C-alpha cells in the first residue's frame, strides 16, 4: 500500500474537519490539560480580589445580589445570583466529586480494600483534626461556629499542584491524594448539610427520600435517559431546599446512586458495528428510513459502552472546572483589603487549622491505619510524601470559602477569607517543596 493510500485510510477513520474545528482545537486541548481548571480558578480568584478593591467594588457586590427565581402557584423559588451559584452550582460540583468516588470504589484503584481504607483514614484525619486546632483558639469565642471551614480540601487546586509536579511524583501518590480529597469533600458536605442547615422539616425531607428511592428504582429497571434522571434530581434538589437541609447534599447522594454498570460490552458493540457497517468502502448508504434506524442503533450502542458514571463525568468536567468553580470564585473570593486585620483571632485560627491540623491529622490517621494492619502504603510512597500530600490538602480554598459563607456573620467573613487565602498559599508552597524533595529521595533510593 502506498503512503498516500495509507494516509487516506487513516483519514477515513476520523471525523471531517471544518474551519471551526481548527479554531476550537487549541481551546479543547487547553480544557483537557490536567492543571487548566486550577489555572482558570486562580485567575478568577485574582480577578475577584482586584474588583473587590477597585472603584467598581460596590457595583461588583450589587451584581451578585441580583434576585433570580420563579413562581409556581403559591410556591416561590427566588434567591440572589450569589446564592444560586453557591447552592445550585456547587451541587453540580459535589455531584461530580461523588461520581469520581463511586468510579474509584467500583472500577478504579480503590477496589483494593487496603488502599481504600488508607484514603478513608487519611480523609478522616484531615476532617477531624483541623477543627480541633481551630477550636483550641476559638472555643467560647465569637468565631466558634466556623469550625467546619477548616475541614475540606480544594480538589481542583490539589490536582493543579500535582500536575505541576508531573512525573517527578509516583502515580500512587496522585491516586492517594485525589481519593482522599474526594472523601474529605463528601464528608465536609454532610457536615454542612447537618451542621449549617436551617430547622429541618422532616415531613418534607421524607419526600426527598422517596425521590432517592425513585432514582434507585429507575436505575434497577434499566432507565438509561440522563434527561429523566436530571428532571427527578432537580425535583429532589427543590424538595431538600424546602426541607431546611442544605440542598448541595443532593449532588453527593445522587452521585453515589449513579449506576456504574455498562449496558453494552465492547465485544457486543464490535459485533453490531460489523453487522451494520458496509463491508466495502465502495458501498454507499442509500439513505432510506431503515438505514437511518440502523445508524441510530449503532450510535446508541457506542454511547452505551460507557457507564452512566463515566458519561456524566465526561459531560460535567468542563462545565464544573471552567464555569461553576470560576463563577464560585468570582462570587465568593472578593476580599476587601482595606478592612483586613492580620491579627484577627479568626484569621489565625483558620490558618492554624489548615497549615498544622491538616498534615498532622492525615499523617497520624494514616499511620494508625497502617499500624493496625487495616491499610498499607502503596508502592513508591513514603511517609515524607504523605506529609507533603497532607500539606497540599491544607489548600482549602473553594470548599472553605463555601462553608465560611454559611458559618460566619457578615462582619467575620473577611477575616475568615483572609485566613483561607494565607493558609492555602502557605500549604501549597510547603506541600509542593516537600513532595519534590521526598519524591527525589525515593527515586535515589531505588537507583
Curated annotation (Swiss-Prot):
Disulfide bonds: none annotated. InterPro entries: Na/H_antiporter_dom_sf, NhaA. GO terms for biological process: regulation of pH. It is a multi-pass membrane protein. GO terms for cellular component: plasma membrane. GO terms for molecular function: sodium:proton antiporter activity. The keyword Chaperone does not apply. Keywords: Antiport, Cell inner membrane, Cell membrane, Ion transport, Membrane, Sodium, Sodium transport, Transmembrane, Transmembrane helix, Transport. It is found in: Cell inner membrane. The chain crosses the membrane at residues 30-50, 81-101, 117-137, 146-166, 175-195, 199-219, 220-240, 315-335, 350-370, 383-403, 415-435. It catalyses: Na(+)(in) + 2 H(+)(out) = Na(+)(out) + 2 H(+)(in). Belongs to the NhaA Na(+)/H(+) (TC 2.A.33) antiporter family. Na(+)/H(+) antiporter that extrudes sodium in exchange for external protons. PANTHER family: NA(+)_H(+) ANTIPORTER NHAA, SODIUM ION/PROTON ANTIPORTER NHAA-RELATED. NCBIfam families: NhaA. This is Na(+)/H(+) antiporter NhaA 2.
Amino acid at each position: 500500500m502506498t503512503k498516500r493510500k495509507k494516509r487516506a485510510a487513516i483519514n477515513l477513520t476520523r471525523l471531517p474537519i471544518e474551519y471551526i474545528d481548527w479554531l476550537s482545537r487549541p481551546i479543547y486541548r487547553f480544557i483537557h490539560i490536567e492543571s487548566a481548571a486550577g489555572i482558570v480558578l486562580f485567575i478568577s480568584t485574582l480577578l475577584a480580589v482586584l474588583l473587590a478593591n477597585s472603584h467598581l467594588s460596590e457595583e461588583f457586590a450589587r451584581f451578585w445580589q441580583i434576585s433570580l427565581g420563579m413562581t409556581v402557584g403559591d410556591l416561590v423559588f427566588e434567591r440572589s445570583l450569589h446564592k444560586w451559584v453557591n447552592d445550585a452550582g456547587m451541587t453540580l460540583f459535589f455531584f461530580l466529586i461523588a461520581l469520581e468516588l463511586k468510579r474509584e470504589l467500583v472500577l478504579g484503584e480503590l477496589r483494593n480494600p487496603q488502599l481504600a481504607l488508607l484514603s478513608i483514614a487519611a480523609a478522616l484525619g484531615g476532617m477531624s483534626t483541623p477543627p480541633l486546632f481551630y477550636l483550641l483558639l476559638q472555643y467560647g469565642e465569637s468565631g466558634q461556629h466556623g469550625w467546619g471551614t477548616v475541614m475540606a480540601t480544594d480538589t481542583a487546586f490539589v490536582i493543579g499542584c500535582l500536575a505541576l509536579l508531573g512525573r517527578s511524583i509516583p502515580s500512587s501518590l496522585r491516586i492517594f491524594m485525589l481519593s482522599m480529597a474526594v472523601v474529605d469533600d463528601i464528608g465536609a458536605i454532610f457536615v454542612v448539610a447537618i451542621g449549617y442547615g436551617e430547622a429541618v422539616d422532616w415531613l418534607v425531607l421524607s419526600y426527598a427520600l422517596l425521590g432517592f428511592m425513585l432514582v434507585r428504582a429507575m436505575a434497577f429497571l434499566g432507565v438509561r435517559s440522563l434527561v429523566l434522571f436530571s428532571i427527578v434530581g432537580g425535583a429532589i434538589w427543590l424538595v431538600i431546599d424546602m426541607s431546611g437541609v442544605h440542598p448541595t447534599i443532593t449532588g453527593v447522594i445522587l452521585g453515589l446512586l449513579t449506576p456504574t454498570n455498562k449496558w453494552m460490552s465492547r465485544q457486543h458493540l464490535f459485533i453490531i458495528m460489523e453487522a451494520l457497517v458496509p463491508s466495502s468502502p465502495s458501498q454507499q448508504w442509500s439513505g432510506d428510513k431503515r438505514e437511518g434506524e440502523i445508524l441510530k442503533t449503532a450510535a446508541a450502542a457506542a454511547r452505551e459502552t460507557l457507564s452512566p458514571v463515566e458519561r456524566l463525568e465526561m459531560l460535567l468536567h468542563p462545565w464544573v472546572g471552567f464555569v461553576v468553580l470560576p463563577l464560585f470564585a468570582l462570587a465568593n473570593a472578593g476580599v476587601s483589603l482595606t478592612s483586613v486585620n492580620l491579627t484577627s483571632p479568626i484569621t489565625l485560627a483558620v490558618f492554624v487549622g489548615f497549615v498544622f491540623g491538616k498534615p498532622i491529622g492525615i499523617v497520624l490517621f494514616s499511620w494508625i491505619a497502617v499500624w493496625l494492619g487495616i491499610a498499607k502504603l502503596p508502592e513508591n510512597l513514603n511517609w515524607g510524601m504523605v506529609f507533603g500530600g497532607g500539606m497540599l490538602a491544607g489548600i482549602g480554598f473553594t470548599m472553605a470559602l463555601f462553608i465560611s459563607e454559611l458559618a460566619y456573620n457578615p462582619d467575620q467573613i473577611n477575616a475568615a477569607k483572609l485566613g483561607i487565602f494565607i493558609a492555602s498559599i502557605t500549604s501549597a508552597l510547603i506541600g509542593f517543596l516537600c513532595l519534590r524533595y521526598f519524591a527525589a529521595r525515593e527515586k535515589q533510593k531505588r537507583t
